[in-house]
């Protein structure tokens, strides 16, 4: 049986709540592109939640999405606090998840090696 700390459990609940907001189209800012919430790290005191997201697109689209998410922080914070039923409303920070792009880069390099070697 795996045991998870409270911040990990709350992070998973926050991730699900924000995913639900996105699925239901409640973030209507046109700057926010199609994003995927890849994870949430919550501080031990549950007062800060860093939300990691990924998206396809160029640097300008990423910057626009970040601005849209920053503008929606208050709304997201209220909705998350209500959905997760938290006593303290965590401050939300959005961060682009670079690991997805790095994984894509590694996959591309492996494909190139396979094609060169004839695997």
From Swiss-Prot:
Keywords: Cytoplasm, Ribosome biogenesis. One of its GO terms (biological process) is maturation of SSU-rRNA. It holds the Pfam family RBFA. InterPro entries: KH_dom-like_a/b (IPR015946), RbfA (IPR000238), RbfA_dom_sf (IPR023799), Ribosome-bd_factorA_CS (IPR020053). One of its GO terms (molecular function) is ribosomal small subunit binding. SUPFAM superfamilies: Ribosome-binding factor A, RbfA. It is found in: Cytoplasm. The keyword Glycoprotein does not apply. One of several proteins that assist in the late maturation steps of the functional core of the 30S ribosomal subunit. Associates with free 30S ribosomal subunits (but not with 30S subunits that are part of 70S ribosomes or polysomes). Required for efficient processing of 16S rRNA. May interact with the 5'-terminal helix region of 16S rRNA. Belongs to the RbfA family. This is Ribosome-binding factor A.
């Amino acid at each position: 049986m795996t045991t998870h700390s409270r911040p990990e459990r709350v992070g998973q609940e926050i991730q699900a709540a924000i995913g639900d907001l996105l699925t239901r189209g409640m973030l209507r800012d046109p700057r926010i592109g199609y994003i995927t919430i890849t994870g949430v790290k919550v501080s031990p005191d549950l007062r800060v939640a860093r939300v990691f997201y990924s998206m396809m697109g160029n640097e300008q689209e990423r910057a626009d999405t970040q601005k849209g998410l920053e503008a929606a922080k208050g709304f997201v914070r209220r909705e998350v606090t209500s959905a997760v039923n938290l006593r303290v409303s965590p401050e939300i920070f959005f961060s682009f998840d670079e690991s997805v792009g790095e994984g894509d880069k590694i996959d591309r390099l492996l494909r190139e090696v396979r094609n060169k070697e004839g695997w």
